Amino acid sequence: MPFKTSPVFHIFDQQHQEAKLLFLALGKQVKSKKAIELQLKLEFLELFADLMEKIDFESQNQGNDLFSPFKSLKKALRKTHHLKLVEGNLKSREEDSGLLYDSYRAYLLVQKRKIQKEAFELAVGSSLKIWDDFREKALLASRGIKPLTINTAINQLVQEELESIHKELKSPIHSQGFRDLFESLRKIIMLENLLIQLGFNPIFVNSIHDEIAQLKENLKPWYSNHLAFQTLSGFLAEKTSISKKYMEWIKELKEEKKSLSSEIEKQAFSFLNKILV
């Protein structure tokens, strides 16, 4: 007997189709822009899998099972995204300082080729069957789900992220704490947008929603700085002697990270005080 397809599956299906096309393009040539687009699509598909797991209380590993074939690819694509941010930081440094960092640029090129090779091999080594299986399992998992059930599950996932932030975020916030905060905010925003797409009222009032989005946006410069500092430190660790221009740059990155961390920590705790009263 035919069954009614859940509205949440229609949203999943659109994202799935777009992700599959990007995956096919990746199997021909790895380009940073397409890789980042695919990473973002996979992040949504993973969130959908988490939502299905939350709804199906009898199968607590369902979400992991749904998305597990894509975890390695997502990890490789994230590396591509991170390197793109590091390259952008190098470009800005050269433009602002008028100096060239040729040896570091060559080092990044080697890293880029390794990362692209990893992503390419994962793409060409994977069967399209994993995409078809994912869609079929998602269709079955979403069958017969009532709108209220979806609404409740999304609210529960958002609450879990907020509780995680509240539990894990302690002053002073360390690098892992900032990364976890960014991930939690990213998930909360996607879940809120999904609620709205499904025709439900958002969880937060506009002012809080805007503050969440702004805090996530403000974390981007911190993340870029963190990756630049981490990568440059790795490069310099291989050197027996370090030139003045590199010493000055790493020092400035460290000072910038300290300043950004202090500012975002204030914003994060101000946000928590508003949201968890």
What is the meaning of each model-derived region?
Residues 1-277:
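Function-determining surface determinants
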